[in-house]
Amino acid sequence: MNSKILWKAKKFQKNKSNLFKYEKFLFSKYKFKITQNYNTLLRWSIKNPKKFWSSVWDFTRVKGIKNEKLEKSKIFYKNKFLKNSKLNFAENLLSKNDNSKAITFINESGIKKNRTWKELNRNVDKLIVFFKSIKLKEKDRVAAYLPNLIETVESFIATSAIGSIWSSC
């Protein structure tokens, strides 16, 4: 069987890709050059897992406390990368705070509702204030029986922001 390439990215498209940006980041940090070759990056990540995962954390600008500890195992999926690092999902999710669209909701009747990042942040902040007023705290559990609405997402994010555990159906 002869395989035919169906599509190939143009140079300007490659240069706008996240892989290209990550390549530039790796070169600036480690002087490692992958020249837009995925297999080169794959081999490097396997050979240097500690550097790879640390660089992914830095490149994606994760907010939190990074511990570069690596607990290796002979069984790949049992490796523990960045062990004991700490981050807050909500803090990372809500790093944007402008008027661009954050969430679009469309119900079964076709009614559409949007939230901007600014609105999402404001609503989550209000919920956090409320949750704290009722003494909800880290490791508490919140179980909800709610429909798939923007307000449900906001409640989940606010719960996560204070370190509580969210469960819904």
Task: Label every model-predicted segment.
Residues 30-32, 90-116:
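AMP-dependent adenylate-forming
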Residues 40-44, 103-157:
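Conserved AMP-binding/adenylate-forming core of the ANL superfamily
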